[in-house]
């Protein structure tokens, strides 16, 4: 060894980082040869010490952590609490998954820290501790799996497994944990085998793209540069230093008047430190992006060589170095995944804690309420928020970073070290996210219910895709679904009670056709008679406005009803519109089907602003043949306002109401034929009337035949009109495609001309390139009449202005301008529709919601029925409403229905078990058949008063043995009532034996003495929600449209209590009253004076953006998909998740979803640029900025993957690759037919130079090719053919006569020539034309130098604009979102 000298002994541990610094300093001071000699001595010393120590590893050296037991127990307790939250509907499945993952990840990390402390305190010389924490062998993650806990695992797809492995490898795994562990181990093996080949193929493609990039000049003379700044808050200082070192300045740098660095100066460590200390201006540097060359690069734009620390030499193949620099780390990093065994290495959020006790205050205007990703309520701040904590005498200030969650309320008292805010995790974790779709499946069968927050997706008009507008619950009402094969033979109907176990039913009695299921709902019981209600006196009222007529709702088509011209009650917050009966329609002149009412079918009965409430189809605007409409030259509204839109068919399909007073219909005959039909007429031929077209089809008119063949059908059109050939019809050519008014004189040939008597339409028919003629087609003119007598159509009382709403009449054309209209033979086409539009007068101070809820209300006393349409403007109550897909179940009645008792005696026989249930029927539209669901007593919970309790209002759950059979109803009638469900057939029909009779849909004035039903008095519920005993002397006015019922004890009617609604949904553990135990989750289906029946239900919380499957009221079986969540998840912390992303970016595949507002953002960007610089400069600089920003974005995306793994690649290598895949443009117009063809790929610089040379703009758009496509679009066909698709490339090159100039390395290797790099480069360049190694070339000609300076001066003026904008928008990412 070398002779020792007296040096200072540094007693410090040399880890990997310290060793790197030592080697770097040794190279700087002593050089490469002497440094290698010193390192050999260090290696020899290490081997000697390791041999002397003789560390061995045994199973006794694996020391377990004593605190592991209570840590795991605490994590299990937190998971159990969160599971209860999910069952009660407080959090959804994704929030529970996130919370579970973070709980177990935090537990695992804490155990890892405890493991290190345990080793240091108990056995610091433990061999496991020495090896792992010194970095000699193994790492902390592996030792943690040996002595801590194996933790969360990833499956082979990289998805997280929710169930953690609580055991470690020292203790041994259970069978379940072993299977989960095999997932992670298999993931490591698969990644090691498969990903290595992927990384190798990625390296090959990268080298193919840039193999011809060689340094061929010293300076390209560019004046452009990329501006970077260390103090804009966007770039960390470490990355800023790595970006600058080795670059060349593109412009001088000044601090005040003093120049500290000049253009073309190499940036070293000293200059970077000087720039950081002086806080200089933004620095403009030269990069491969700014080089003006096309197929090579200059020394100054490339910068310093990484091998010897000086400017790169001429002839160096920097392209191949760049390709290997990116691809080779991926090959090496795939081997790391085997050692961690697929263990999840994610990240958790960071917390901000209170420094002391005190009251916290912050500005509430800067935050808004939200939910955390775990479902907790919090406040979200988008900018920096300053929080003050006032203790006794000290005022603490805490700065909360942007995009954080505030977990406490304003003016709340907090304790020291309490978590007050949650900040977003670091960029290394957050930026690596992927979008996941998680499906939630139903645990049991039942019936789907949802709230008004679920809306139909407008892009799927006829599908069953539903989305959520805000956070709400989905409910599966428990029941036992039966398959549709059993329904067809079943005699049971909706609300019948039957056995839940036996479906073999025989029925001896069949009701007459004049009796429908809703009027004759039978309670099936063994040998029991249905009670006869004929002796119950119906209530007759003397006042005209309260006469109750028998009426039903005839179904015209889906969701259409008759509209009445009778009464309309006016209230402050609602409309009440009576619906007309059949008998009332018989005495009117207008036909029954003329006016129809529309309840939105896909919006759960919600009328938004400008919704169509009713419509009238005028027979004058009806056609029986096909054609198209033309609005003529009359213009529509130029300014589109929000109130000019009409919501059509309940979905977000908005149509602009056009102010046209006249429109035209162009008739034509259209036949839609199957693709296999044999047509007996020729295309583009003339036929007469009644010509045989097919075997069983004849033409109704004569004219020109036009046949269009589409995918699976043939569209045959017959145009009738006059035909003029273009011999002298030059005048007609000017009128082609326009409407010609009467009185216009047109020339039909050279000599003749005629005046047009009626409106005509001139259409040009092209037979081939040189053959065409004109077809003059007749028009049918329609005038839109505003003078329709509204009193005969709609009730005049409805059209009056109200405080909160207004109904207005609007005429609009059903079909767009020029749109083809297809009609069937037996169906007519309606052109104009007169609509009654619902307009909401929204008050700014009003607390009502913008939308109104519509529901069909039925008022009945015994067999007297009346239907109303009710529109509420109040906010939606707690109860959920929605659409039932069993609309009305009512059939047409006989004329003598009013004289028949609806409840006649019947004897029904059925073998019943003790377990009774009630049937609910639904119409399954997808299958086209009915399905039923049986609600048995096991699915209900009954709450009764506690006997002997001190309080009268205490309710407890009854025991099952006391009530073996839950008797739901004691008399004829349905099982409870429902909330205001649109189009519901069973709406508030509750006939019971209780003291409270539900009559809250009834008006009474001057009623006769109290009528008795089974010797019980009627009790009414007034508007103040009190139960009132009837007084025959008083004029009682009831709240006819209020759903809420009081839940009172019979001995305490005067007391007030919580209001419960029929149909209301109650979550589990929600306390309605402090004196009562909490209810189970379910729906209130029956309310008595002394008890309430709740149908058990399972709530599913869903957040905005979730997709709801199925339809409202649809029957779900166990395991069916209920809802799908879209959420973001951090990627696993290994390169296997990053390498595919690098490949996606380099191949220009779509990584993230495109922003919904992308078009608007691009338009705003263009307006901003043109506003700053003016229109001519704006378009040019905007186009260049787009290319520059997209290149910077791609570089940043690729760098993030490798920096996350701790791999440092210089930006210049990635920039060379990105420069090649973004250097082509696509010619978009035939503006230069003599140079380029449309669709041709050319170089960007070539297009710019050609445009300047020819003084003619070239229309092109920039494209990202991807590395594979860029390898197949080079200047060398030999290089392309040796890559892939050899036959196609060579044949295409031979047909095109391509010439290969052998400028790249690969083509010279293939042909055995000297590669144009290294020493072979000097033979290609004339020595007299080579640049000197000086940075500034000499000026041989004064005039030439002056011209050059002049051009450079103008170029600098342009580039100064460009550099300024690039600096301001350096981090704008417009093409790809960071994942």
UniProtKB/Swiss-Prot annotation:
Subcellular location: Plastid
Cofactors: Zn(2+)
SUPFAM superfamilies from the UniProt entry: beta and beta-prime subunits of DNA dependent RNA-polymerase
GO cellular component: DNA-directed RNA polymerase complex; mitochondrion; plastid
A Gene Ontology biological process term: DNA-templated transcription
Catalytic activity: RNA(n) + a ribonucleoside 5'-triphosphate = RNA(n+1) + diphosphate
Protein origin, superkingdom: Eukaryota
Cofactor binding, note field: Binds 1 Zn(2+) ion per subunit.
InterPro entries, per the entry: DNA-dir_RpoC2_beta_pp, RNA_pol_beta''_euk, RNA_pol_Rpb1_3_sf, RNA_pol_Rpb1_4, RNA_pol_Rpb1_5, Rpb1_funnel_sf
Molecular functions (GO terms): DNA binding; DNA-directed RNA polymerase activity; metal ion binding
EC category: transferase
Key words, A-Z: DNA-directed RNA polymerase, Metal-binding, Nucleotidyltransferase, Plastid, Transcription, Transferase, Zinc
Pfam family, one: RNA_pol_Rpb1_5
EC code: 2.7.7.6
Function summary: DNA-dependent RNA polymerase catalyzes the transcription of DNA into RNA using the four ribonucleoside triphosphates as substrates.
Binding partners and assembly: In plastids the minimal PEP RNA polymerase catalytic core is composed of four subunits: alpha, beta, beta', and beta''. When a (nuclear-encoded) sigma factor is associated with the core the holoenzyme is formed, which can initiate transcription.
NCBIfam families membership: rpoC2_cyan
Family that this chain belongs to: Belongs to the RNA polymerase beta' chain family. RpoC2 subfamily.
Protein name, per record: DNA-directed RNA polymerase subunit beta''
Organism (species): Cuscuta reflexa
Gene coding for it: rpoC2
